[in-house]
Design a protein with these regions (language model features):
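Residue at a conserved register position within TPR or TPR-like alpha-solenoid repeats
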Residues: 6, 13, 51, 85, ...
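Canonical positions in the second alpha-helix
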Residues: 32-33, 66-67, 130, 164
Length: 169
């Protein structure tokens, strides 16, 4: 279809502005398709992908959530949703690592630590639901295990570690 054509052309283009133009056209066509099929989770997922690629993370989050609403077993939508949430982590970690040892820096470090933990906590329900839908998804299990480790939820960390070991034999 026309939307697929635009995304393929954009993927094959070496020209950044041309690629952006085709991706915008793809996005417009996906938005039009949603007006005709408003409960199609795949359309929302595609909009999430394009929004994420364009740095529109708030829109991407909403589109992924809508994709899951209409297609609750959509593994890729859960994975991408968590990835977008965790996208904010690197800037937090970078700032944490750049701080010194002054009282002001220690206060800022503690604030950033809370922000980082909040990102992790936001991911937990999506990862848990994803694991319900896809119980052997190692990426989701590892991510959830790591989050539990950072948050100090040792029992949950051990439970997820045991599941991973069971799956991997």
């Amino acid at each position: 279809n026309e939307a697929d054509l635009y995304i393929r052309i954009s993927n094959n283009s070496d020209d950044e502005s041309e690629r952006d133009l085709y991706r915008k056209k793809f996005k417009e066509l996906m938005e039009l398709a949603i007006t005709k099929d408003p409960e199609n989770g795949i359309l929302y997922y595609n909009l999430g992908v394009i929004s994420s690629e364009q740095g529109e993370n708030d829109s991407a989050l909403e589109y992924y959530k809508r994709a899951i609403e209409f297609k609750p077993d959509y593994v890729d939508a859960y994975l991408n949703l968590v990835a977008v949430i965790l996208d904010g982590e690197q800037s937090i970690v970078d700032e944490m690592n750049s701080l010194g040892t002054s009282k002001k820096d220690n206060i800022r470090y503690d604030e950033l630590k809370v922000e980082r933990e909040d990102l992790y906590k936001e991911c937990i329900p999506f990862l848990e639901k994803l694991i319900e839908v896809s119980p052997t998804n190692i990426d989701a299990l590892n991510t959830l295990k790591n989050i539990y480790g950072v948050l100090g939820e040792n029992e949950k960390f051990k439970d997820i570690s045991a599941k991973i070991n069971e799956i991997q034999g």
